[in-house]
């Protein structure tokens, strides 16, 4: 396929910035300026990798050979809010935190439970970001995206099979999403944001280098005393804590003392340390409870 690349910025041997602050480099890193250039990237390399905020991502020390696309240009980070209709539209590279804050300031409620989740809009939709206070699918109207041929598509909320930390969007690359929100008092909404954020700061190591939750919360296949009942989803952090893993460290990475499902990196840490700690924690939890933990963090490896 002949693809016009004249105006597309592509770096060679470029760093991949993640919240962990570890890992290898991208052989090629593209910075599309808009959706059309993002479509060009897909036509160049359908199996490319999308880099949003780098929060829920671990890149192996060897880096990746596929084209990595960074959603860091202004046109891909725009947010439009219409208080009269109660609608908000955000582009794929928009900060989830900025979206939540702007909606509250405009007197539109419904997304406050997402405060404190580090993500761009696209990644948040694909992972159905959320927690105890709600998930992003709750207020979604529709998703705009590009298929792996670079063609534009729009999918309504009722056609998307959302679940726990998944969207069912498959290979679709999200370019924007629209939300329907409820009118509310801006002062009350901002106070709700402060309360939720204060709780997260008390219970999570938000000031340290971490990707957020490393593991998904598992559903138990049997009742475990003091943990949970069969067929119920339980906290992976609780299992890790009860397995005696808080403070466990390998190399420059340790299990947080504040929240056991968070791994914290220190200067000099490597992605290999994180991967080794993931294996060690999974082994301890399985040995203690017979529960197989699945990773929530996305791992990029060279093929």
Give the positions of each predicted feature:
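Core subunits and conserved enzymes of cellular information-processing
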Residues: 90, 99, 104, 126-133, ...
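Phosphate/pyrophosphate- and phosphate-bearing ligand-binding catalytic cores of soluble enzymes
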Residues: 10, 57, 146-276, 283, ...
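Preference for bulky hydrophobic residues occupying beta-strand positions
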Residues: 30, 69, 90, 143-145, ...
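A generic local secondary-structure boundary/capping motif
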Residues: 57, 100-103, 111-115, 128-135, ...
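A short, compositionally biased
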Residues: 74-75, 137-141
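Anion-binding (especially nucleotide phosphate/pyrophosphate-binding) glycine-rich loop
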Residues: 2-129
